UniProtKB/Swiss-Prot annotation:
PROSITE patterns: RICIN_B_LECTIN, SHIGA_RICIN. It comes from the Eukaryota. Pfam families: Ricin_B_lectin, RIP. Glycans are attached at N490. GO terms for molecular function: carbohydrate binding; rRNA N-glycosylase activity; toxin activity. 1-alpha repeats lie at residues 345-387. 1-gamma repeats lie at residues 432-465. The B-chain consists of six tandemly repeated subdomains. Only subdomains 1-alpha and 2-gamma possess a functional carbohydrate-binding site. This is Ribosome-inactivating protein PMRIPm. It is an enzyme of class 3 (hydrolase). 2-gamma repeats lie at residues 566-599. It comes from Polygonatum multiflorum.
């Protein structure tokens, strides 16, 4: 029977060769790594396969490759409510557990890596017709991957970054990345899968594949290196992002409240380090997204709106470079974090004079240390927002224009002290549908509840770091958003916003993102990106601050930048950079409407 099975196997291979039109060449079995025998019968594990070929590679082909990998690993996954960010499936049947990623270098050398769809973890690879497994490989991996080809000697290291770095004799911060380094890594893995060169090569491969799929910021760095045919060395922000992916995922998933609304308020801070070695204490989703462009979440807990997978629990996942072991398929616990609320012009929501009497107004005031008692608020699961003074943020009534005060939580009018925090920055009273508003652009302004017109004066960020986030905004064809205003001149003469080649130190490409949803010129923060109207095809320009709806923007997780007042997105007109025109447009999902933030390190 084994002879018969072998003959059948040969026939299948011949059929595959003929079907693909391969003539006169030897078959490389790693092109068919899922062929296996069970008993006397041949089996085909139908794992999907994708390819990235460095020959003729462009940033566009790399972008498409990463997008396809994301699509495969998130099939059947749920998304976080109100976002487009998928959560990887906690468990999947073995028949869908892996994806093969074929990497081809300039010499035609092929290395195939196996990626676990539950973690984006590289778990094995094949090179030179041999399959290689890490020293901590599981039975599931050894049983299902690279069967039908010889097994190389077991690797002396695990797939964890700590083990790889030890074997490589170098840490990630000293190992360059880029197309030339990926080309070399494929060659090294092809020639020798077991030595220190292999460990170093795997560090390159893992970051340029798995980490780029997890974070659009890393994808963007690789894309730019391909476009420029250059290399880059991971900075401290990239490395801490890689280390904290699990913790990020946990905090995002625990930001869905008991009503299934994604507030984006973290229970615990995620600490990152920027490239100037300054600490970033990230305690809300908006800041996390702007700094990391997080694209995929690891399953950490079941959110209120997630479906529960009833398959048997998967084996514990030990993540690359992390000190966390994910154990439980448990429901997310929603905390009651205490944070500042900042909004118009970056000012903080403040209890006037720090007095705790019922009816005392709530205002906006400059944020300051030592003012925690009157500028910090606890977000309770019952929908109340409570001052450290012990009283609730309460609307005086349910009519447009009523003022907002602190009041005893138990004796306030029913529903007047309930609030819904939305990921777009709106804080709404669910009874009246009115939203928290700072009506005037001056400190000491008393807050009101008003009809939602999606104005900047109605946008808030919940988080203790109230400083604007300074960033470049990268758009179509890897070019940067730029304004052609000149300092110390009449700004009305220099109002155009357009795309140009990214230049690191060009001031006109630096933008400050404020808590009120405004995008401001970093060198003159009185100037805002403004929609010159509310209709499709209206231009986007620079104007002085007004607090209007046409000056508020939302960076969506799908890569669009939305003006919520017009319900239109930022668009490169006609996908033609040479027109030097950015406009409002209905969302189409096309590349000329996709944007990335590349945040800049803070000065010490």
């Amino acid at each position: 029977m084994r002879v018969v099975a072998a003959i059948l196997y040969i026939n299948v291979v011949v059929a595959l060769i003929c079907g693909l039109g391969i003539q006169g060449g030897a078959l490389d079995l790693q092109d068919y790594p899922s062929v296996s025998f069970q008993g006397d019968a041949m089996q085909l594990q139908d794992y999907p396969s994708i390819t990235f070929n460095l020959k003729g590679a462009t940033w566009q082909t790399y972008r498409d490759f990463i997008e396809k990998l994301r699509e495969i690993v998130t099939r059947g996954a749920t998304t976080i409510a109100g976002t487009s960010i998928p959560v990887l499936n906690r468990v999947v049947p073995d028949s869908r557990r892996f994806v093969y990623v074929r990497l081809i270098n300039l010499d035609g050398n092929v290395v195939t890596i196996a990626v676990d769809v539950t973690s984006l973890y590289v778990v094995a690879f094949s090179a030179n017709n041999n399959g290689y497994f890490f020293s901590d490989s599981t039975e599931t991996e050894r049983t299902n991957l690279f069967v039908g080809i010889p097994r190389g000697d077991p690797l002396g290291f695990t797939g964890n970054y700590n083990s790889l770095e030890n074997w490589a004799g170098a840490d990630r911060g000293s190992i360059p990345l880029g197309p030339a380094l990926l080309n070399k890594a494929i060659r090294n893995l092809r020639s020798n899968g077991r030595d220190s060169k292999a460990a170093k090569s795997l560090i390159v491969v893992i970051q340029m594949v798995s980490e780029a799929a997890r974070f659009r910021r890393i994808e963007e760095q690789v894309r730019r290196s391909i476009a420029d045919q250059d290399t880059f060395t991971p900075g401290s922000l990239m490395i801490t992002m890689e280390k904290k992916w699990s913790k990020m995922s946990q905090q995002v998933e625990r930001s869905v409240n008991d009503q299934g609304i994604f507030t984006g308020i973290f229970t615990r801070t995620v600490q990152l380090i920027d490239d100037n070695l300054q600490t970033l204490n990230i305690d809300n989703f908006n800041a996390l997204s702007l700094h990391t462009m997080l694209a995929i979440l690891l399953f950490r807990c079941r959110t209120t709106t997630s479906s529960h997978n009833t398959l048997p629990a998967a084996s514990n996942i030990v993540l690359m470079g992390e000190d966390y072991v994910d154990k439980d398929d448990e429901k997310c616990t929603v905390g009651e974090p205490t944070r500042r609320i900042s909004g118009r012009a970056g000012w903080c929501v403040d209890v006037k004079d720090g007095r705790d009497n019922d009816g005392n107004p709530i205002q906006v005031l400059s944020c300051g240390d030592g003012q925690e008692r009157k500028q910090q608020w606890t977000f309770h699961r019952d929908g109340t927002i409570r001052s450290k003074l012990g009283k609730c943020m309460t609307a005086y009534g349910f009519k447009h224009g009523e003022y907002v005060m602190i009041y005893d939580c138990d004796t306030a009018i029913a529903g007047a002290n309930k609030w819904v925090v939305s990921i777009d920055g709106t804080i709404t009273n669910p009874i009246s549908g009115l939203v928290l508003t700072a009506p005037r652009g001056a400190t000491g302004t008393t807050l009101l509840v008003e009809k939602n017109v999606h104005a900047a004066r109605q946008c808030w960020r919940v988080g203790d770091d109230v400083e604007p986030i300074v960033t470049k905004i990268v758009g179509f064809q890897e070019k940067c958003l730029e304004a052609n205003y000149l300092e110390n001149t009449n700004v009305s003469r220099y109002t155009k916003v357009f795309l140009d080649d990214c230049v690191l130190d060009r001031q006109q490409q630096r933008w400050a993102l404020y808590s009120d949803g405004t995008i401001r010129a970093d060198s003159d923060r009185s100037l805002r990106v403004t929609a010159d109207g509310h209709r499709s095809l209206d231009s986007i320009i620079i104007l002085a601050c007004k607090g209007w709806g046409n000056q508020r923007w939302v960076f969506n997780t799908d890569g669009t930048i939305l003006n919520p007042n017009a319900k239109l997105v930022m668009d490169v007109k006609d996908s033609d950079v040479s027109l030097l025109q950015i406009i409002l447009h209905q969302s189409t999902g096309k590349p000329n409407q996709k944007w990335l933030t590349v945040t800049l390190p803070r000065t010490s």
